[in-house]
């Protein structure tokens, strides 16, 4: 975000508690308020409808907002704006008013968040046409995806699992990576393999493909330790657009597949996939 704000004066960052020195309750944007000032990094009222809805007006006058919904659980008051205005503006205006924005959403269960700070919302979001949804599993991917989202003309929602901030949880150490260069951009809609099964196990019919994303990548890696060379792990990185071709190739290769998600199974994105 710092690099984007340095390169683009039209880039703004706002949301609840992101201003001044704090940079969000998870400190992921700490000091940016001090660096760029209150006109470009600022706090908003506790009103998600305003945070999301304001991106329409900001975009219309040539600004490029990066906004934060403090927790995925709080996105519900903003869904009306996301569904009726942000996602449809391009279509309803015949291309005259695209809403180009990045909406960051810390998500997932972490620590003692309880019922109001632990939700996953990807199944709701993937049913909204007109937005793109990404869900990185490590710091390097997040940087590349953030750059791609910023330069994309469409509204992009970035889901960031709270348990992956700082790589503090046991088994998630690989979320901490060497920072890529400033021009590092990852195209949206491209999955990647993070673990490969051996050719021998595949030929024996003893291999399995796990399709997952976000925190699920690390749960899958832990489970794979019990099945030597038998597991292929596919990190989606992008939920929409979805890398259907690569998913199909992997599942066809193994003839066995598990879709791993944190959400309840019934009527979910994972079940649909």
What are the functions of these language-model segments?
Residues 1-159, 162-166, ...:
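Thiamine diphosphate
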């Amino acid at each position: 975000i710092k690099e984007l704000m340095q390169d683009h004066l039209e880039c703004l960052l706002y949301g609840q508690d992101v201003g001044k020195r704090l940079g969000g309750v998870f400190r992921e944007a700490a000091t940016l308020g001090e660096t760029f000032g209150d006109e470009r990094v600022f706090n908003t009222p506790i009103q998600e409808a305003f945070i999301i809805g304001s991106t329409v007006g900001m975009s219309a006058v040539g600004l490029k907002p990066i906004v934060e919904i403090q927790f995925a659980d709080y996105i519900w008051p903003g869904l009306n704006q996301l569904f009726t205005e942000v996602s449809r503006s391009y279509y309803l205006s015949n291309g005259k008013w695209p809403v180009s924005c990045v909406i960051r959403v810390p998500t997932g269960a972490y620590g003692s968040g309880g019922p109001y700070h632990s939700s996953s919302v990807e199944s709701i979001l993937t049913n909204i046409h007109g937005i793109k949804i990404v869900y990185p599993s490590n710091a390097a991917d997040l940087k590349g995806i953030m750059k791609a989202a910023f330069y994309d003309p469409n509204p992009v929602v970035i889901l960031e699992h709270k348990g992956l901030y700082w790589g503090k949880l046991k088994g998630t150490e690989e979320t901490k990576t060497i920072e890529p260069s400033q021009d590092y951009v990852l195209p949206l809609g491209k999955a990647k393999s993070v673990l490969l099964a051996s050719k021998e196990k595949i030929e024996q019919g003893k291999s399995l493909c796990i399709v997952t994303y976000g925190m699920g990548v690390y749960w899958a890696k832990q489970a794979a330790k019990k099945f030597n060379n038998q597991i292929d792990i596919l990190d989606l990185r992008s939920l929409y657009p979805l890398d259907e071709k690569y998913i199909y190739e992997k599942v066809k290769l193994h003839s066995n597949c598990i879709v791993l998600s944190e959400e309840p199974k019934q009527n979910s994105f994972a079940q649909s996939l």
